[in-house]
């Protein structure tokens, strides 16, 4: 049907263009110079191509959103959770379900570790904070950023702002807020973020206990965070990272997912997180093959 509508649009545009030319010929004794006519035709063709391209991109985005909705509904129904997903690619960003308004928990350790690497943090401390999600190591990195810059909160916020992925960073950093959409945007940027190389490598080497959801997928680096809300008693488990594709030029797509459920057990949320991650990965792989998702070349650059 998309090709039929495109053909109809092209036909209508050409008919209108032809009629306009015919009317112009009747009203004027002298026709337009041949060069002007060719130029006008070229401009009309370019404008029409732009309209068709925009319409195709919009249709791809709507179709992707609908498919994400179906993935989310299946996971929610089967596991009794609420879920959210964000995808960031060259072709655009899509966010469905939960927006990620809950605390960031340990996902915020990624930009903290990058900010710490920028001021010379010990790589073993970074490994502990990312690979094992060690809270004491993360606090040591935060303290070093505070000592070196005088404002750890501002340093981490500035880093995220630089890559158009802002968060509300709190001194009790686990309670920061960072939407899934912005996490996916930062994830897509990770391969090119200054001073992020060691952090990026650590995200591919998580301990077995944390190697689930996005982290368990092939060609994907991610960091998770989880915790119990003191406000509504709901347990949130969220992850963000980057999915890369191999080829002549590496390509990347930023991903962020979240499940929220009653209870307080990490293991209870894990099956839902795994199912959500696999569903999203399958969808993204197919959308890339179909051209509905166009990854960033190497990484997302601002």
Predicted regions mapped to residue ranges:
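Penicillin-recognizing serine hydrolase domain
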Residues: 27, 35-83, 92, 146-302
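C-terminal motif of bacterial Sec signal peptides marking the signal peptidase cleavage site
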Residues: 21-25
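Buried hydrophobic packing segments
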Residues: 112-116, 141, 183-190
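Short alpha-helical patches at coil-to-helix transitions and adjacent helical residues
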Residues: 105-110, 135-138, 177-184
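N-terminal export and membrane-targeting signals
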Residues: 1-16
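Acidic helix-start/capping segments at beta-turn-to-alpha-helix junctions
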Residues: 86-94, 124-147, 298-301
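Glycine/charged-rich beta-loop-alpha catalytic/anionic-binding loops adjacent to active sites
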Residues: 90-99, 122, 165-166
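Active-site SXXK
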Residues: 101-121, 129
């Amino acid at each position: 049907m998309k090709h039929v509508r495109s053909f109809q649009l092209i036909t209508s545009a050409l008919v209108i263009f032809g009629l306009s030319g015919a009317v112009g010929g009747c009203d004027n004794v002298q026709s337009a110079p041949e060069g002007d006519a060719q130029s006008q035709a070229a401009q009309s063709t370019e404008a029409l191509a732009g309209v068709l391209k925009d319409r195709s991109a919009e249709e791809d985005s709507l179709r992707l959103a609908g498919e994400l909705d179906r993935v989310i509904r299946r996971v929610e129904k089967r596991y009794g959770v609420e879920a959210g997903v964000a995808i960031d690619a060259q072709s655009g960003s899509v966010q469905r379900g939960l927006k990620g308004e809950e605390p960031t928990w340990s996902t915020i350790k990624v930009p903290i570790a990058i900010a710490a690497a920028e001021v010379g943090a010990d790589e073993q401390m970074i490994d502990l904070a990312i690979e094992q999600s060690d809270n004491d190591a993360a606090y040591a990195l935060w303290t070093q950023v505070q000592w070196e810059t005088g404002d750890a909160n501002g340093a981490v916020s500035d880093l995220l702002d630089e890559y158009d992925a802002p968060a509300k960073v709190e001194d009790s950093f686990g309670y920061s807020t960072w939407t899934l959409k912005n996490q996916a945007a930062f994830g897509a940027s990770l391969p090119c973020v200054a001073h992020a190389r060691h952090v990026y490598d650590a995200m591919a080497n998580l301990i077995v206990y944390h190697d689930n959801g996005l982290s368990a997928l092939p060609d994907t680096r991610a960091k998770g965070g989880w915790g119990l809300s003191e406000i509504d008693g709901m347990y949130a488990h969220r992850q963000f990272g980057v999915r890369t594709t191999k080829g002549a030029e590496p390509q990347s797509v930023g991903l962020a997912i979240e499940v929220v459920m009653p209870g307080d057990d990490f293991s209870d949320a894990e099956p839902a997180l795994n199912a959500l991650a696999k569903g999203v990965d399958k969808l993204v792989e197919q959308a890339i093959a179909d051209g509905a998702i166009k990854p960033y070349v190497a990484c997302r650059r601002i």
